[in-house]
Amino acid sequence: MVRIAIAGAAGRMGRQLLKATVNSEKAALGVATERSESTLIGVDAGELAGIGNVSIAIVDDLAKAANDFDVLIDFTAPVVTLANIELCKQYGKKIVIGTTGFSEEERVLIDLAAKDIAIVMAPNYSVGVNLVFKLLEKAAKVMGGYTDIEIIEAHHRHKVDAPSGTAIGMGEAIAGAMGNKLSDVAVYAREGITGERTRDEIGFATIRAGDIVGEHTAMFADIGERVEITHKATDRMTFANGAVRAAVWLADNQSGFYTMQDVLGLDDL
């Protein structure tokens, strides 16, 4: 049984992760953390998640609970995640990262940490989204050279980063399949007289509204036809279940940088 720690347990994803961990047949909840100023310190994690008492109280010091978990799942903020990575390095723990919005410099730090500990990092832990990434690679190889490629994503009003990590992941999958680097071909905003689009650019459009859990569409548009590959999430539990699955998988692997493609074995398709 893999003992899991949940960082940011009181957040929207944190509560779903608590449920997914407790409901898993292969994992057990070992630790649940929150910020030191949180009024929820000391509250039972199960009560917080609405699943009843689990005899695990919310704590504010992950280091003091280092003996109580094997893998940390972190869906928080870049500054918090980077600090938790250092803690995992110090105590020889493994980490599943669902946080998005890292800078290129911060991504380098994560890559370096993977030389010492095992890390799974993905922009999205849904099985369906990760299958979409693979489908996009296939579509880009067949259609990318002669179509206009656009990515449209929609999320709830509270999401703080844009485009979403999943949208960027879609762009990276497409660009990589075409032998390009996303940063060289991405267009994140259009306004005013922009002129005609170039053939090689990948455009992004972002919607923030209401309570949309997550919707992503990649469009390959030609004259006379277009192909759209879409994923719609209606419940955050799909992300939480995928993250717990990744944590269980990671427990059996050595130091290195892994993605959900590795967890699901999609690289073999």
Swiss-Prot record:
Residues involved in NAD(+) binding: G8, A9, A10, G11, R12, M13, E34, G98, T99, T100, A122, P123, N124, Y125
This chain belongs to the protein called: 4-hydroxy-tetrahydrodipicolinate reductase
> Any idea where this protein resides?
Cytoplasm
Q: Cite a single Pfam family from the UniProt record.
A: DapB_N
GO biological process: one example: lysine biosynthetic process via diaminopimelate
Looking at the UniProt record for this protein, which Gene Ontology cellular component terms does it annotate, in alphabetical order? cytosol
The record describes the protein's role as:
Catalyzes the conversion of 4-hydroxy-tetrahydrodipicolinate (HTPA) to tetrahydrodipicolinate.
* Family classification: Belongs to the DapB family.
Alphabetized, the UniProt keywords read: Amino-acid biosynthesis, Cytoplasm, Diaminopimelate biosynthesis, Lysine biosynthesis, NAD, NADP, Oxidoreductase
Please give the pathway this protein is involved in: Amino-acid biosynthesis; L-lysine biosynthesis via DAP pathway; (S)-tetrahydrodipicolinate from L-aspartate: step 4/4
| GO molecular function term, any single one | 4-hydroxy-tetrahydrodipicolinate reductase
Q: What is the lineage of its organism?
A: Bacteria, Pseudomonadati, Pseudomonadota, Gammaproteobacteria, Vibrionales
- EC code: 1.17.1.8
Q: What is its main location?
A: cytoplasm
Q: Specify the species.
A: Photobacterium profundum (strain SS9)
Q: Which reaction does it catalyse?
A: (S)-2,3,4,5-tetrahydrodipicolinate + NAD(+) + H2O = (2S,4S)-4-hydroxy-2,3,4,5-tetrahydrodipicolinate + NADH + H(+); (S)-2,3,4,5-tetrahydrodipicolinate + NADP(+) + H2O = (2S,4S)-4-hydroxy-2,3,4,5-tetrahydrodipicolinate + NADPH + H(+)
- Where do the catalytic residues lie? H155, K159
Highest taxon above the source species: Bacteria
Sites where the protein binds (S)-2,3,4,5-tetrahydrodipicolinate: H156, G165, T166
Q: Give binding positions for NADP(+).
A: R35
